[in-house]
C-alpha cells in the first residue's frame, strides 16, 4: 500500500510543479488509530519549497488524491492538524489482503525484492581457539537472521564463516596443546598462573605466554596422547597439535551452531588466501597505487589519506601480516565470486578496523557500496539488575553451550534479537528462565499454540474454517485491527531486511500476538453462527500463519502445544 500511495502522491506533485525530482515521500502509520491507517507529512515539508502554508498544500493534495486513488483500496483521504494527509483503507482491500494471506500460507511474507541478486553473509567468524562464547552467540544469531531475511526477500543467499588459521593465535593454541600433551607424556615441572579474577591455575612450565587455559585444551591433548602415546614428544613440529586442536574445536563449534538451528554453506580461511596468492596480490596492488610505504621494518597503509589519525600497519616487522591484510584479501575474493551484496557481522571492537578494509578495497577498484558492515554491541549476563558469572567447566569464560543448556535454543536466539545490534544487550537470565508469558519468546509461542488449540476445539464441536467463508462478516473493530496488523507482515520483513535490523521482527510479532489476544477476548468463535464462526476461524488461521512464518524467519520453533 505504501508503494501504491507514493506513486499516486508523486503523480500529484509532478502536476503541481516546482517539486524536486529527488523529494522522498514519507508515509507512516499514525500513533493513534483514529487518525487513519497511513499518514504523510508531504505538505509540511514542501511549504517552503512551494511558498504556501502547509494546510493549503495539504487540502490541494488531498483533493487531487481523492480523484486518483482506487476506492477499493482507499476509503478516505483526510487533512488533519497543520498539514498532515491521512488515509484510511477500504474494507475490500483488507478482505482481499486477508484472502491472499490465507492462499499464500507458509510463503506469506516472501517478496522478490532481491530476485536475481546474490548475497553473501559472513558471520560468527570466530577463530577455532576455543568454544564459542556469549558474544559469538549474538553474532551468530544476528547474522543467521539477516541471512533469513534476505532469503525471504528474494536474494540467493550464501552463509559463510571465515577464520584466521595462519597467525599467532593458532600458533599459541598449538603450543598450549603441546604443553598439556607433554605433561601427560611425562613428568614436566609446573608453574602457577594468577588469572584476572585472582584465581590460580597450575600449568606446565612449557605453557606459552597468553596460552589457552580451558579444560578443552586438556581434552585435546588427552586424545592425542591416547592415539600416539609419547611419540609426538620427539618432534618440534606444531602441525599435529594445531591440526588436532582445529579439528576438535571446529567440531564443537559446528555442534553449537546446529543447536541454534544454524547451518553454514561454507567456510573460508586465511591460509587458503596465502596459498592462492591473494594476500600478496593485495599488497602489490596497494603498493602499485602508491598507498604503502616501509618504515621501522614494517609495511604501512596510508589510511590517513582517508581520514584516520594514524596510518595502519599491514605487515609487521616480523614479516607477518596484521589481520587486516588477509581480511582485505578475503573481501577481494568475495567480489570476484560475483556477489551483489556482502554483509559482514562484526563485534563493536572492529569499529576501527573495518574502515581500513573498505579504504583498501576502494584503492583496489572495488565497489564498496556493495559491502554492508553490521557492528553489534556486547552482551552482559544479568539476573534481574545484577551482573552474573555462570560457572563453566570447559573454558575460563561462559560458553555459548552453557547458555543454550541453561535457557534453551529458542530463548537464546530470541533474546539476542530483541534489541538493535548497535545497543548493548543485557541478557536477563531470570527472565529467560521464566516459562510463562512473562518471557517474550514464550508469549509468542503461547499465542501460536493457543490459536492451534482454539482451531482444534472448534473443529471438535463441528465448526470448520471453510475456505469459502465470507470474510466480509469480519466487521468488529478488533477483527479489523487484527487484519491490519497481519497485512503489515511483508512490509515489516522487507524493512527489517533492508535495514539489516532483525529486531524489527520480534517487536512486530509481539504486536500481532497482542492484537490476536484482543480479538479472541472480544470475538468468540465457539457459540457463534456457523458463517461468522468460519470467518473468524479463517482470521485465527491467518494469525497463526503470520506468527509461524515470523518465528521461522527468526529461526525459532512454533509449537502447537506448550
From Swiss-Prot:
Reactions accelerated catalytically: tRNA(Arg) + L-arginine + ATP = L-arginyl-tRNA(Arg) + AMP + diphosphate
Q: Which InterPro entries match?
A: Arg-tRNA-ligase, Arg-tRNA-synth_N, Arg-tRNA-synth_N_sf, ArgRS_core, DALR_anticod-bd, Rossmann-like_a/b/a_fold, tRNAsynth_Ia_anticodon-bd
Give a GO biological-process term.
arginyl-tRNA aminoacylation
User: What GO molecular function terms would the record report?
Assistant: arginine-tRNA ligase activity; ATP binding
Source organism, top-level taxon: Bacteria
**Keyword Aminoacyl-tRNA synthetase (UniProt):** yes
What keywords tag this UniProt record?
Aminoacyl-tRNA synthetase, ATP-binding, Cytoplasm, Ligase, Nucleotide-binding, Protein biosynthesis
Q: Where in the cell is it found?
A: Cytoplasm
* Motif ('HIGH' region) on chain: 126-136
Assigned EC number: 6.1.1.19
Tell whether ATP-binding is among the UniProt keywords: yes
Q: Which residues form the signal peptide?
A: none
Q: Which family does it belong to?
A: Belongs to the class-I aminoacyl-tRNA synthetase family.
Q: Which proteins does it associate with, and in what oligomeric form?
A: Monomer.
This chain belongs to which protein, by name? Arginine--tRNA ligase
